[in-house]
Amino acid sequence: MTEEKNPVVIMETSMGTVKIELFKDKAPISVRNFLSYVKDGYYDGTIFHRVIKTFMVQGGGMDENLQPKKTKFAIKNEATNGLKNLRGTLAMARTSVVDSATSQFFVNVVDNAFLDHAGKTPDRFGYAVFAQVIEGMDVVDAIREVKTGNKGGHQDVPVEPVFINSIKLVE
């Protein structure tokens, strides 16, 4: 019996290409959700709307005018899966409500242990890691270095928009 490979996607950004492996065994709900948005072309033309050089880059839900795109239903938070918020991992973004993730995700640009599951209360539940950058971390590092400011009531917004041109499933 051969082990089925994890799905891989290619994210084309306005700053370069990032190849990402999805951990379908450890985060099946998050991966299925992410791939449903990928297959719908949902991420095409969205931006990285929150960039914090010493923390993470977040995208997957807003257009260049910071207007949120319509999302599907919220999913169960899989932060108890044992995966850690290490540099280069992707996790589902959410509100303070534990099971509120929809389309938005972030790439950890440093190890962020404080985002890992540490308890059952909302403030300690953590953020579900579901993927890992396998090529193109240099592109993510370039994104984290862009100049940011305040725009439309949001902080840490790139002054020049950084686009997700497309995300496509390759294997």
Ranges and model annotations:
Residues 1-171:
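Cyclophilin-like peptidyl-prolyl cis-trans isomerases
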